[in-house]
Amino acid sequence: MHKINVAQKLGTFEDHWSPKIVGELNGQHVKLVKFQGEFVWHRHAAEDELFLVLHGVFRMDYRDDAGAERAMELSQGEFVIVPRGTEHRPVATEEVHVMLFEPAGTLNTGNVEGAMTVPNPQSI
């Protein structure tokens, strides 16, 4: 058992949209990621995801059950759980620091593979 200094871990990388694993519990990865710009629309068929804002503000775009596009803004200290199967994309005009909780092995781009896909996130 050991403690993790989140600020120190965030200081070890600068890249955006590249989640880093900082812990694991009960088959879940705890990840840190920096957002800036627009991510790809995607969904996770089998995994829920929790996004906790540590610093900054971002918008979570998502499509509801009827396929209508919706959005919510999240600020420091707020979190959202994106249910499995929900199409979504984070958008950040300024750099945002986020902690993610998701099942180990969850692909960051879900059902979409491309330039933003990180198949094997680094542990830091």
Predicted features and spans:
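Short acidic-glycine-tyrosine-enriched beta hairpin
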Residues: D64-R84
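Short, conserved beta-strand element in jelly-roll/cupin
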Residues: K34-F35, H44-D64, F101
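A cytosolic small-molecule/anion-sensing beta-strand core signal
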Residues: N26, L54-H55, S75-Q76, E94
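A short, N-terminal "cap"/entry segment at the start of jelly-roll beta-barrel domains
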Residues: M1-K31, E113-I124
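Ligand-binding loop in jelly-roll beta-barrel domains
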Residues: R84-G114
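Conserved short histidine dyad/triad with adjacent acidic residue
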Residues: D15, H29-A45
